[in-house]
Curated annotation (Swiss-Prot):
Domain of life assignment: Bacteria
Catalytic activity: L-glutamyl-tRNA(Gln) + L-glutamine + ATP + H2O = L-glutaminyl-tRNA(Gln) + L-glutamate + ADP + phosphate + H(+); L-aspartyl-tRNA(Asn) + L-glutamine + ATP + H2O = L-asparaginyl-tRNA(Asn) + L-glutamate + ADP + phosphate + 2 H(+)
Membrane-spanning ranges: none
Name the UniProt record assigns to this protein: Aspartyl/glutamyl-tRNA(Asn/Gln) amidotransferase subunit C
Assembly: Heterotrimer of A, B and C subunits.
Organism name: Campylobacter jejuni subsp. doylei (strain ATCC BAA-1458 / RM4099 / 269.97)
Biological role: Allows the formation of correctly charged Asn-tRNA(Asn) or Gln-tRNA(Gln) through the transamidation of misacylated Asp-tRNA(Asn) or Glu-tRNA(Gln) in organisms which lack either or both of asparaginyl-tRNA or glutaminyl-tRNA synthetases. The reaction takes place in the presence of glutamine and ATP through an activated phospho-Asp-tRNA(Asn) or phospho-Glu-tRNA(Gln).
Family, per entry: Belongs to the GatC family.
Length: 94
């Protein structure tokens, strides 16, 4: 897959994001990521055992701690359009 200006513009539209700085650098980084994933697809993993966790017995449990957090507000503050606690995005499916 070739990452170019046309594809980057399409990704911007679908994701409702704007990439304004260093577009050429962004294209180069996306191309590197795609090439890395292609290399991962070439790995022969048929002889490898399927694992869910690298820790024997599973991951240790942790104590849940309740914390006040404004993560929702912080994320929504970055959105170009929002209403209450939701993102407003353009309709892409008819």
């Amino acid at each position: 897959m070739q990452i170019d200006e046309k594809l980057l513009s399409k990704l911007e539209k679908l994701s409702a994001l704007q990439i304004t700085k260093n577009r050429n650098e962004t294209i180069a980084q996306l191309s590197e990521i795609v090439n890395f994933v292609k290399k991962l697809n070439e790995l022969d993993l048929d002889s490898q055992e399927i694992t869910v966790s690298t820790i024997k017995g599973g991951a240790p449990l942790r104590i849940d701690e309740i914390r006040n957090s404004n993560v929702i507000d912080e994320v929504l503050d970055c959105a170009p359009k929002k209403q209450e606690h939701f993102f407003i995005v353009p309709k892409i499916i008819e």
